[in-house]
């Protein structure tokens, strides 16, 4: 964010000019920073090592924690921090940069949360895999578990994390979520219909929270709603997402997809022939303070190479996750 006194009246005047000029620039910079919020979301692909032991979860927890791309944000939303050990390691690695953190959604309903709402169950095999870390104090933390999922998602406490964050003299409300996955194991249940209901649960929560309309409300995470080929279709699930959340469409920059098997080594190994998808977003509520500008930029950071061994064969990758991070810049009025 990131003088010396001179002899004589003229020199003294010049010195004052320099001094006050520097203070003005400093004040302007401080004002700009106070009116800008930087929020990132990243699905970090930390599946449980009990089921998926060979995806370098602990290695990547260290690589992500040391990576430049995740630094210098105000708030970071993490998705798929399912593996207990790797997620604890990642959160620990991020603690210096982001000392204010939530627990992982759905892992427990203890006093690390101000409230636990929705359909939390301690008997559900997997947690919800969402956590939020912040540079600024988090003054309220609520976890909410969705009423319904389909396919394997039924075996996790998926939902959303709500945080009320105080940046200097203003409050910002950030919801991090990971919606229902597209899954053939859902049978006759449409994953899109489940996602719509989950979005309605988020919107109902916000409505009932009675947040002052001059405060900013942001939604972020892996929505599992594909923007590609849907932007100009008013009947698309993409359009419906914004309508349901009463959210404004951001400006998009950077890479054209957040999951891309043509450019990402992990995605390529898993699904080499699948088309690219844009699934991860940071968007703002239109029912509350409206940002003068919000941009979603897809980054493509490459990680140092990391290697795993499976059945005596070595596999080497150079990505932090199968998803790319999305960095949002929000200009607040």
Curated annotation (Swiss-Prot):
GO terms for molecular function: sphingomyelin phosphodiesterase activity. Keywords: Cytolysis, Disulfide bond, Hemolysis, Hydrolase, Secreted, Signal. It comes from the Bacteria. It is found in: Secreted. It is an enzyme of class 3 (hydrolase). Its cofactor is Mg(2+). Residues 1-27 form the signal peptide. One of its GO terms (cellular component) is extracellular region. It catalyses: a sphingomyelin + H2O = phosphocholine + an N-acylsphing-4-enine + H(+). SUPFAM superfamilies: DNase I-like (SSF56219). Its EC number is 3.1.4.12. One of its GO terms (biological process) is killing of cells of another organism. Disulfide bonds join 150-186. InterPro entries: Endo/exonu/phosph_ase_sf, Endo/exonuclease/phosphatase, Sph/SMPD2-like, Sphingomyelinase/PLipase_C. Activated by cobalt and manganese ions. Belongs to the neutral sphingomyelinase family. Required, with sphingomyelinase, to effect target cell lysis (hemolysis). This is Sphingomyelinase C. It comes from Bacillus cereus.
